[in-house]
């Protein structure tokens, strides 16, 4: 939605927030919010479990862990922004006499389709929520580029990368790309970016990270083939062999995350494009929004299933209905089998007493 400030003295005439409000009955909003909160709670559990497994079951170099861990943890920033927006939708937060529970398109040049206000007073939390969502999206997109560069560095420094931390690499990449993410978030928030610019930024970033991933993977696969060749001419150290295998595993994980991310962005972009062309009803935006907010269902699951050790612990963290029914069935079997066991024990006890009674009589 775009907020237009009618105050002529302001230096910020427009704000562009990546959020949606809906012109719905309050009861419908409450029902939808309740369903969303249940789903977000499940996502919260998924994120916590995935982050715990990723950190505890260490399968990669520390530098890779430092860069990838935020992919899971930064979801909390996104969901806080959504909860703030939800409070405005449910009228928990209000702006004086201004009614904002109305659907506004994501981007438009038509002032009639904007939220027109005399000042931004009372909208501070909504603005913060919009910034959080922008920052999340740019952080994830640029984070993928950072991971690709880190794996490129691991391949270039293959001789001693595994034996040393070189922690300055993930720190420098994180600081650099966070500066870019915050800058882009501010530019988008203050309506300095167009919708084409934002989409172009995401597409170019994803394309660059994908290209780097594929190139580095191809190089490492070639090295692996040389190492396994029986007539190889070059001697590879154990550290180099281990680093190549780790690079391949990390690149495979990175590709899966990028494809999951691209799939999420594609779904959101497709629905928003149809909305801008007024081909679908505004209520469909709920699907587009939650494709973003519920992304841990896809991204975390894809990541956890990429490594067998992670997959096992991840599956154990979610007891299925089948397991529950099997446990219930086993409990019933145990209860039913107790009766013959008790009768058998009683019979043995009686037979033992009779035996000792007869033995005692024979002695006397």
Swiss-Prot record:
UniProt cross-references to Pfam families, sorted A to Z: Sre
Keyword Transmembrane helix: yes
Broad class of the protein's primary localization: membrane
Entry's localization field: Membrane
Superkingdom to which the source organism belongs: Eukaryota
Segments passing through the bilayer: 31-51, 64-84, 125-145, 167-187, 195-215, 257-277, 290-310
Topology versus the membrane: Multi-pass membrane protein
GO biological process terms on file: sensory perception of chemical stimulus
UniProt KW keywords: Membrane, Transmembrane, Transmembrane helix
UniProt xrefs under InterPro entries: 7TM_GPCR_serpentine_rcpt_Sre (IPR004151)
Gene Ontology cellular component list: membrane
Cited PANTHER family: SERPENTINE RECEPTOR, CLASS E (EPSILON)-RELATED
Family statement drawn from the similarity comment of this UniProt entry: Belongs to the nematode receptor-like protein sre family.
Name the UniProt record assigns to this protein: Serpentine receptor class epsilon-27
UniProt source species: Caenorhabditis elegans
């Amino acid at each position: 939605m775009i907020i237009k400030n009618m105050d002529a003295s302001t230096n910020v005439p427009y704000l562009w927030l990546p959020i949606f409000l809906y012109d719905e009955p309050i009861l419908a909003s409450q029902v939808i919010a309740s369903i969303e909160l249940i789903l977000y709670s499940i996502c919260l559990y998924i994120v916590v479990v995935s982050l715990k497994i990723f950190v505890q079951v260490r399968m990669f170099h520390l530098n890779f862990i430092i860069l990838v861990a935020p992919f899971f943890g930064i979801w909390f920033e996104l969901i806080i922004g959504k909860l703030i927006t939800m409070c405005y939708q449910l009228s928990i937060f209000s702006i004086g006499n201004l009614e904002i529970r109305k659907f506004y398109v994501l981007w438009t040049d038509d002032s009639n389709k904007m939220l027109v206000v005399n000042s931004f007073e009372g909208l501070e939390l909504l603005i913060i929520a919009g910034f959080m969502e922008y920052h999340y999206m740019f952080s994830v997109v640029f984070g993928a580029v950072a991971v690709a560069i880190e794996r490129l560095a691991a391949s270039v420094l293959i001789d001693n990368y595994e034996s040393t931390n070189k922690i300055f690499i993930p720190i420098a990449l994180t600081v650099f790309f966070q500066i870019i993410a915050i800058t882009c978030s501010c530019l988008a928030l203050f309506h300095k970016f167009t919708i084409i610019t934002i989409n172009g930024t995401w597409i170019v970033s994803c394309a660059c990270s994908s290209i780097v991933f594929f190139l580095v993977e191809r190089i490492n696969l070639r090295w692996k083939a040389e190492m396994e060749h029986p007539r190889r001419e070059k001697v590879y150290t154990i550290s180099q062999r281990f680093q190549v295998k780790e690079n391949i595993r990390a690149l495979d994980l990175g590709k899966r995350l990028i494809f999951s991310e691209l799939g999420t962005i594609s779904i959101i972009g497709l629905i928003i494009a149809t909305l801008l062309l007024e081909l679908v009803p505004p209520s469909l935006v709920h699907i587009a929004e939650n494709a973003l907010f519920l992304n841990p269902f896809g991204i975390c699951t894809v990541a956890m299933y990429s490594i067998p050790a992670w997959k096992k612990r991840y599956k154990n963290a979610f007891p299925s209905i089948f397991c529950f029914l099997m446990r219930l069935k086993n409990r019933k079997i145990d209860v039913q089998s107790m009766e013959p066991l008790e009768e058998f024990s009683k019979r043995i006890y009686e037979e033992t007493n009779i035996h000792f009674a007869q033995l005692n009589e024979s002695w006397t």
